Regions:
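N-terminal capping segment at the start of a domain
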Residues: 21-50, 62, 259-266
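Second-shell loop/turn segments in exported
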Residues: 36-46, 78-81, 116-125, 152-153, ...
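Bacterial Sec-dependent N-terminal signal peptides
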Residues: 1-21
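His/Asp/Glu-rich mid-to-C-terminal helical/loop segments that flank catalytic regions of hydrolases
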Residues: 44, 259-316
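A non-catalytic alpha/beta surface segment that caps or lines the substrate-entry region
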Residues: 41-94
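Alpha-helical metal-binding/catalytic segments enriched in His/Glu/Asp
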Residues: 92, 104-105, 109-110, 114-159, ...
């Protein structure tokens, strides 16, 4: 009888685990956000604002809380050619058991239309936003140890503008932010490889994420964060960059560039659906580990990295 009871407990546990992320909803969010309706989600366009409305609608459905009476936090900046552009960051949160904060982010903008061709950005970065929504859904039903701030950044493709604006105009005390987890391009890889970038700066992250890819069907690799790598150092290549400049530890999940990167062929039908679901599962496993062991992660990052980062900031 005890063995039978144990079997049923394990069966129930396995079933719940399998339902942590809804594959159907994950793919639905990606497919919708990368459809022609949003015309590539370029910052400052009506279609970008339509995408923002979809995402904040999902925030509301999930039950996220918001700051300053809205999920939407507008900001203004000048483009590289001097044009005044309005962007909007989308921010919701789930209160944790502690005062510490983990920022979980994904940029929702892409590059729009060029020569009548729509660049829908399925992998870059409708996939990250869909993953963010899946994580928010999970943690709404599983209270985290730390407060989780879910941020869909705008203006990433125009120079990480949303991330810089967020740090200049924080919705909460910035000293509470102890970790940033960024999702950018997580649905397209033929080798079943997902990179977790950030352990060069904080080696403890690699230890915390050990075996986070178990039963996900994909492999988490570490790298692309050594300053000696030049362009292959991804630290400043997505929204984690401004956080790194502010000495905030980060983990950036993403894949290496692929044949459809920044091309009109970055479409829903060209992503790897099994890989995407596995990546989302592995990221959830990773975030659970990070949430449970956040106290181990310190802002005292690798001194060599900090020196190189300051040099890059001066050069820029």
């Amino acid at each position: 009888m005890k063995k039978l009871l144990t079997f049923f407990i394990l069966l129930i546990t396995a079933t719940v685990s399998a339902q942590d992320i809804s594959r159907t909803q994950l793919l639905k969010d990606l497919e919708i956000l990368s459809s022609d309706v949003y015309e590539g989600r370029k910052t400052g366009t009506p279609e970008n604002r339509m995408a923002a409305n979809y995402i904040t609608g999902r925030f509301k459905d999930i039950g996220l809380s918001y700051y300053q009476d809205s999920f939407k936090h507008p900001f203004a900046f000048k483009s590289r050619n001097g044009e005044n552009i309005q962007g909007t960051n989308l921010i919701g949160y789930i209160e944790g058991k502690s005062n510490r904060v983990i920022v979980i982010s994904a940029h929702y903008d892409h590059v729009g239309i060029t020569k009548s061709l729509i660049y829908n950005g399925a992998d870059d970065n409708a996939s990250g936003v869909a993953g963010l929504l899946a994580l928010a859904t999970y943690y709404k039903n599983h209270k985290p140890n730390n407060t989780l701030l879910f941020v869909a950044f705008d203006g990433e493709e125009m120079g990480l503008q949303g991330a810089y604006s967020f740090l200049r105009n924080p919705v909460l005390d910035g000293s509470r932010i102890e970790l940033m987890v960024n999702l950018d391009m997580i649905s397209h890889n033929d080798k079943k490889e997902l990179y977790a970038v950030g352990s060069f700066k904080n080696p403890i992250i690699k230890k915390i994420l050990k075996n986070a890819d178990e039963k996900s069907g994909i492999n988490i690799l570490f790298g692309h964060d050594d300053p000696k790598l030049g362009r292959d150092d991804w630290t400043m290549q997505s929204d984690q960059g401004p956080f790194a400049q502010n000495n905030i530890p980060f983990v950036y999940f993403g894949v290496e560039d692929h044949r459809d990167y920044h091309k009109p062929t970055d479409e829903y039908q060209n992503i790897n659906k099994d890989f995407f679901y596995g990546a989302a599962t592995a990221i959830l496993n990773s975030l659970n580990k990070l949430d449970n062991q956040l106290k181990k992660i310190s802002r005292n990052t690798n001194p060599a990295f900090q020196r190189t980062l300051k040099e890059k900031m001066i050069m820029n």
